[in-house]
Amino acid sequence: MIKNGKPFSNENGWEDKKLLDQLDPEEQKIVLEWVRANFIPIKRANYKHSSYYLKHVMQYENGIYLTNNQFKDAMLICGFNPVDPNELNWRYRISEKSPAIQKMNRGECCA
């Protein structure tokens, strides 16, 4: 769900209210640059990839651990709104041509 413009998760009975600003500024910068460089926005929903899986792709590439909620916060900051904010693992309107997804499809990450 979104509260006050920020993601908040308690759908599985465990609260995840950590946000991106709880990382040090350099890590925040790396994460936001990675999101902007690795996802191409589209108009239709892409249900193939969840926030939970995508955060692991990012972690594999840059070594920065994020909670699911922190990753969702980064996506919101970069303008990627969830298809359904009431789901635990958000889906986005991102293209299969996005660099992160192309790397996944080629087996270049998350081995």
Model-derived features: where do they sit?
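Short strand-loop junctions, especially beta-strand C-caps/beta-turns
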Residues: V57-Y60, S95
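Charged low-complexity interaction tracts in eukaryotic proteins
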Residues: K3-L20, I77-A111
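Positively charged, polyanion-binding regions of nucleic-acid-associated proteins
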Residues: L23-H49, K55-V57, A74-L76
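Residues in intrinsically disordered, low-complexity segments of regulatory proteins
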Residues: G13, E33, S51-Y52, N89
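Structural motif detector for alpha-helix initiation sites
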Residues: S50-S51, N68
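Short, flexible active-site loop motifs that bind/organize anionic cofactors or intermediates
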Residues: K18, R44, E61
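Charge-enriched amphipathic alpha-helical scaffolds
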Residues: E61-P85
